[in-house]
Design a protein with these regions (language model features):
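Loop-to-helix transition at the N-terminal end of transmembrane alpha-helices
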Residues: 43-55
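Interfacial loop-to-transmembrane junctions
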Residues: 104-125
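Alpha-helical transmembrane segments of multipass membrane proteins
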Residues: 21-29, 90-95, 125-129
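Transmembrane alpha-helical segments of integral membrane proteins
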Residues: 91-107
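Alpha-helical transmembrane segments
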Residues: 6-24, 76-90
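Membrane-interface helix-loop junction between the first two transmembrane segments
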Residues: 26-45
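Hydrophobic alpha-helical transmembrane segments in multi-pass integral membrane proteins
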Residues: 58-69, 122-138
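Cytoplasmic membrane-interface regions of multi-pass membrane proteins
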Residues: 36-42, 102-109
């Protein structure tokens, strides 16, 4: 019985961090798709645009990797929330770097369903998420 009680002792914190994580992912989805010049959901749903699906999936994965690092290394929920916002900003900056520096026509290429552009954007997003998660230490 003590073992079960010990296992359940961390459950409230799990629920708190997991709930905040889901809220952050939903907020990220809302903000990220508003900042991109194309409508990912329309491209994916109506046009079966693979490049848009890959790019958006990479952005989600990169953000989730980063907030998982924040959850692991945060000292409390407020700390986690601050790092969640930092991770979101890092993903938005990563998109801007790809769009304006690395691959200036990336948005047009994704709209045309050019898969290599979606892969590059996804790879940068995931890479930034991994770096972000690794740097969130004390």
């Amino acid at each position: 019985m003590h073992m079960i009680a010990g296992l359940l002792a961390g459950f409230p914190n799990f629920l708190l961090y997991f709930s905040v994580s889901i809220i952050f992912v939903l907020a990220f989805k809302f903000i990220y798709v508003k900042l991109t010049p194309y409508d990912e959901w329309r491209l994916i749903k109506e046009k079966q645009n693979t490049a848009a699906a890959v790019a958006l999936s990479g952005a989600f994965l990169g953000y989730c990797i980063a907030i998982s690092g924040a959850a692991k290394n945060s000292v409390n929920i407020v700390d986690f929330m601050v790092w969640g916002v930092v991770a979101m900003l890092a993903q938005i900056i990563a998109f801007a770097i790809v769009r304006f520096i690395l691959l200036p026509r990336v948005t047009e290429r994704i709209e045309k369903d050019e898969l290599p552009a979606g892969i590059v954007l996804a790879a940068v997003s995931i890479s930034v998420g991994i770096l972000n998660a690794a740097c969130m230490t004390y």
